[in-house]
Amino acid sequence: MFNIIKNDKNSNARIGVLELPHGKVTTPCFMPVGTLGVMKALKHDVLEKLGCNLMLANTYHLYLRPGIDVIKEYGSLHNFTTWNKNFLTDSGGFQVFSLSNFRKIETEGVDFKSHIDGSRHYFTPESVFKMQEIFESDIIMALDICSSYGIDYSEASLYANITTSWARRTLRAYENRKEGYDGFLFLITQGNFFKDLRKRSTEAILELNSPGIAIGGISVGEPRDKYLEILEYNSSLIPKDKPKYVMGIGTPHYILDAIYYGIDIFDCVNPTRIARHGSLLTDNGILRIKRAGFNVDTSPIEQDCSCTLCTRYSRGYLRHLIKSGETLGVMLASEHNIHYMFRLIQKARNAIMNDDFTQFRKLYLSKYDEGNFNE
């Protein structure tokens, strides 16, 4: 399922290939988030043109709307959405546990209230796996508890223990999956920001020998130095032959940090979310196109970018579209930001191939951190 092609000699960065049911995926890999099986403001053919082979969709949101029975009628999430590349489906755990005032965690599962209409629902590890089996997801995520930064040790320990128990139950369901279904299960480590809990959780998850491992519960509001500390530590506990996934990181500096410590897959809504508000990713930082200084700027967002926006339209025109609320502006900005992330990942792969990733990261971060446009 996972083959390592090249290890960087001066860091833990590596290039690999995931062999998934709907095609090969080269890692490191940034997954765009298509919560409901589609990217906001980006058609499938645009994503394919950009080189996307793996998209994230969310079980919680698909369960609530359009509903599991609807997708079941189509035979799979791929058939329903017409996306013929790979899907990783998140378990929905993060969304459920974000509803802190509307859910109740039990050892059996979690009771929660829909954010749409207030109706009550109950998720178990088995039911969440079954939904993803109906989707025929290429990568399935187990239900887990994503705890917030700053909780006390006893609560973090309890949530890590429940996550491990749910992982065992998910694995049993996966081992009894329907005939012909060939998706891969990723189990999730937890433990908050306590190293002994991280170690205990990871060792227990590794005993289950799932095809892939995810590091959960980081990038949840903690300081960057704490993020780096736990990222490095938890990644070091996972054998190198396992594909490693950190959920919910999508800013360039966090992604380069993750690659440096041996992470293969990451996702985030950030690139398209900020695009909808007129923020564009560049090698020099965030370009905020709504600012008045771009009103008559005839240059592209980035000179060396080959996306539709940069090859055809000016900064001034994009500012006009975004300020006017035109859908085209959001579409162009979203395409640019996803294209930018894919280009950044390709540059990282090239640096790994040349055993130069450490220097690449250092130079990129020195420029990016200083480069927020202030016009």
Curated annotation (Swiss-Prot):
<feature type="binding site">
    <location>
        <position position="305"/>
    </location>
    <ligand>
        <name>Zn(2+)</name>
    </ligand>
</feature>
<comment type="subunit">
    <text>Homodimer. Within each dimer, one monomer is responsible for RNA recognition and catalysis, while the other monomer binds to the replacement base PreQ1.</text>
</comment>
<dbReference type="InterPro" id="IPR004803">
    <property type="entry name" value="TGT"/>
</dbReference>
<keyword id="KW-0819">tRNA processing</keyword>
<protein>
    <recommendedName>
        <fullName>Queuine tRNA-ribosyltransferase</fullName>
        <ecNumber>2.4.2.29</ecNumber>
    </recommendedName>
</protein>
<feature type="region of interest" description="RNA binding; important for wobble base 34 recognition">
    <location>
        <begin position="272"/>
        <end position="276"/>
    </location>
</feature>
<keyword id="KW-0479">Metal-binding</keyword>
<keyword id="KW-0862">Zinc</keyword>
<feature type="binding site">
    <location>
        <position position="336"/>
    </location>
    <ligand>
        <name>Zn(2+)</name>
    </ligand>
</feature>
<dbReference type="GO" id="GO:0101030">
    <property type="term" value="P:tRNA-guanine transglycosylation"/>
</dbReference>
<feature type="binding site">
    <location>
        <position position="217"/>
    </location>
    <ligand>
        <name>substrate</name>
    </ligand>
</feature>
<comment type="similarity">
    <text>Belongs to the queuine tRNA-ribosyltransferase family.</text>
</comment>
<keyword id="KW-0671">Queuosine biosynthesis</keyword>
<dbReference type="GO" id="GO:0005829">
    <property type="term" value="C:cytosol"/>
</dbReference>
<feature type="active site" description="Proton acceptor">
    <location>
        <position position="90"/>
    </location>
</feature>
<feature type="binding site">
    <location>
        <position position="144"/>
    </location>
    <ligand>
        <name>substrate</name>
    </ligand>
</feature>
<dbReference type="GO" id="GO:0008616">
    <property type="term" value="P:queuosine biosynthetic process"/>
</dbReference>
<comment type="pathway">
    <text>tRNA modification; tRNA-queuosine biosynthesis.</text>
</comment>
<dbReference type="InterPro" id="IPR036511">
    <property type="entry name" value="TGT-like_sf"/>
</dbReference>
<dbReference type="Pfam" id="PF01702">
    <property type="entry name" value="TGT"/>
</dbReference>
<feature type="binding site">
    <location>
        <position position="307"/>
    </location>
    <ligand>
        <name>Zn(2+)</name>
    </ligand>
</feature>
<keyword id="KW-0328">Glycosyltransferase</keyword>
<dbReference type="InterPro" id="IPR002616">
    <property type="entry name" value="tRNA_ribo_trans-like"/>
</dbReference>
<dbReference type="GO" id="GO:0008479">
    <property type="term" value="F:tRNA-guanosine(34) queuine transglycosylase activity"/>
</dbReference>
<comment type="function">
    <text>Catalyzes the base-exchange of a guanine (G) residue with the queuine precursor 7-aminomethyl-7-deazaguanine (PreQ1) at position 34 (anticodon wobble position) in tRNAs with GU(N) anticodons (tRNA-Asp, -Asn, -His and -Tyr). Catalysis occurs through a double-displacement mechanism. The nucleophile active site attacks the C1' of nucleotide 34 to detach the guanine base from the RNA, forming a covalent enzyme-RNA intermediate. The proton acceptor active site deprotonates the incoming PreQ1, allowing a nucleophilic attack on the C1' of the ribose to form the product.</text>
</comment>
<feature type="binding site">
    <location>
        <position position="310"/>
    </location>
    <ligand>
        <name>Zn(2+)</name>
    </ligand>
</feature>
<feature type="binding site">
    <location>
        <begin position="90"/>
        <end position="94"/>
    </location>
    <ligand>
        <name>substrate</name>
    </ligand>
</feature>
<feature type="region of interest" description="RNA binding">
    <location>
        <begin position="248"/>
        <end position="254"/>
    </location>
</feature>
<dbReference type="GO" id="GO:0046872">
    <property type="term" value="F:metal ion binding"/>
</dbReference>
<feature type="binding site">
    <location>
        <position position="190"/>
    </location>
    <ligand>
        <name>substrate</name>
    </ligand>
</feature>
<feature type="active site" description="Nucleophile">
    <location>
        <position position="267"/>
    </location>
</feature>
<dbReference type="InterPro" id="IPR050076">
    <property type="entry name" value="ArchSynthase1/Queuine_TRR"/>
</dbReference>
<keyword id="KW-0808">Transferase</keyword>
<dbReference type="GO" id="GO:0002099">
    <property type="term" value="P:tRNA wobble guanine modification"/>
</dbReference>
